[in-house]
Amino acid sequence: MKKKLTSIAIILSILVFSGVLKAEVKLPAIFGDHMVLQQKTDAAIWGKAAPNKSVKVTCSWDKKSYSTKSDKEGNWKLKVKTPSAGGPFKITISDGKAITLNNVLIGEVWVCSGQSNMQMTMSGYRNQPVLGSNKAILSSTNKSISLFTVKREKSLEPLDDFSGEWQQCNPENVANFSAAAYYFGRMIQESLGVPVGLINSSWGGTRIEPWISENGFKNFDWVKLPDKKQEGEFSPQTPTVLFNAMIGPMVGYAIRGGLWYQGESNRNEPSQYEKLMPGLIENWRSEWGTGDFSFYYCQIAPFDYGTGGVNSAFLREAQLKASTSIPGIGMACLMDVGEKTNIHPADKEAAGVRLAYLALAKTYGKKGFEYSGPVLKEMTIEGSMVKLTFDHAKYGLTTFGKELVNFKIAGENKRFYPAKAIITREGISLSSLQVEKPVTVRYAFENFVVGELFNTEGFPASSFRTDDWEIK
């Protein structure tokens, strides 16, 4: 009898102990030590607990506690009020058994996504370096920057979580973090003097469609959505599958904005991309449900794609047009850093810094500096002469000593000829002996060129055209 009672006691102890383990709060990967929460907002925190269990969250910055109850499946979610930038703080979460998140910072959070040019780390790719990265890595230790890289994953169904962890900003971690994102974050942190959290969720070679949720395709009927019940392997190019696995699990995490560097894999469909780019932004904003957060992206850099396919200048044009299609967005131009035989420009600092200029001006309201390259304002034709004026050229235009060689003009016969281009006080004057009656202008409208037109602040002009002739 005594033996039987002892056995029952052991079984009960095991049941009680396992019940405690089961009751322990579980958090998604996005919540952890060294994380950054968006400042001055109602920041969502969520996770798993035992079903119908009370969960309490206590924040060290104001000692305030927030409570909620998990549903019948153990899911819970609440919001905490975050103060102005600061830290480090602690967050304690308990459903009877407490866990503590340490070194929590309050500041500015940005999600960074795209294909290989966003994925490219500070260490670069094999035989493809990042310019000046070794020195930047050496001096990268900064307690006010935290880094999170989402592990690559794809899914036909929305997932609740992904793999990754918040890391402190030091040489070992920066070497393996997105270069464009790091240079952006470093400049934001230095300029604002607040903590910055960077979440990199990118996958090389991918199109834009995988990064949009199913709800985002309602207006894009040319995109075929996948069968969620299909068996076997599927491509990371499949619409929705990267949003489901690499963006969706963090939807709701409070952020200031998004960064995007992608487009090379969509270069043959510029007309569709012009719609899909703002479509992705509106989709993410809708999924987050926190208003029109800022979103800035890089225009693809010039590269020699060869003779097949559509001239990638049309994709750059689509990106330029998209940049004014909806509020709260902007485009960083990279016309001066492209490499003829390398689709991954080494100058990733240019990408990150130009994105940061956009954010500092348009999101944070900083004044007294330029944040964009020259943008065509008006074209006038006087006989055989074409005159162009530009916005974002307050102090004029320059080539920094180079010759203007990338302008072409055409008449009604649609034959383009190199134009003699002269920078004037008002803008640029163009002419060609082969074109007596010009009707249109194109600048740097090729797969690969090295852009030579800048404003005096050093920002390059995008390739552009003034015609709407057939894309080919």
Please state what every model-predicted region is.
Residues M1-A9:
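Bacterial N-terminal signal peptides that target proteins for export
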Residues A9-S18:
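Bacterial N-terminal signal peptides
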Residues G19-A23:
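Sec/Tat signal peptide C-region and signal peptidase I cleavage site
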